[in-house]
């Protein structure tokens, strides 16, 4: 495709979006359109199709690692950064939503905005290829004080230090916490060490007047709730 023809094609797909929105776009056309904003003077359709052929879905494209995206011919540092930034936007939006809501029902001590929480966790760590352990610290009014990436591990484990969590609870004057970690294997079944760690932290928090409300294992396809399964 000549540069003139390519420019005309870009304008046509942009015009299609301006007139009709995203409805009617194939997944590769969405990627093609996005890539026109970070890849100048180049036909982005083949790149978009190769991305979907390799990663199978838009979600997987946006959550793919820098190294994996680097294997796609035509993608450079700028375009990969652009795609990675797009992949982070949902978790930022969901995090902001959670900040403005009471996360725990005071009467039942259950999570009152679990759908948003699960969307946040799935977008933040559900697609990661190594285990990451998150702690959400809550105030006495059940509002989020802080989201913390507590530890980063390997493919099947992360090193979590309960003392560091207790120290943070004291410093923040948190009254409850929610734990979450991902399983890169996509198997949501808790391991023996997951259960033991959960029990240890729940017991230890009581010494500081705080509660463990929930522990969630998240993957890109599902989740496991310790609370729902009666393990807390």
From Swiss-Prot:
InterPro entries: MPN (IPR037518), RadC_JAB (IPR025657), RuvA_2-like (IPR010994), UPF0758 (IPR001405), UPF0758_N (IPR046778). The lineage of its organism: Bacteria, Fusobacteriati, Fusobacteriota, Fusobacteriia, Fusobacteriales. Gene3D superfamilies: 5' to 3' exonuclease, C-terminal subdomain, Cytidine Deaminase, domain 2. PROSITE patterns: MPN. This is UPF0758 protein FN0909. Belongs to the UPF0758 family. Coiled coil: none annotated. One of its GO terms (molecular function) is metal ion binding. Residues 110-232 form the MPN domain. The keyword Transmembrane does not apply. It comes from Fusobacterium nucleatum subsp. nucleatum (strain ATCC 25586 / DSM 15643 / BCRC 10681 / CIP 101130 / JCM 8532 / KCTC 2640 / LMG 13131 / VPI 4355). It comes from the Bacteria. PANTHER family: DNA REPAIR PROTEIN RADC, UPF0758 PROTEIN YEES-RELATED. Zn(2+) binds at residues 181, 183, 194. CDD domains: MPN_DUF2466. GO terms for biological process: proteolysis. Keywords: Hydrolase, Metal-binding, Metalloprotease, Protease, Zinc. A motif (JAMM motif) lies at residues 181-194.
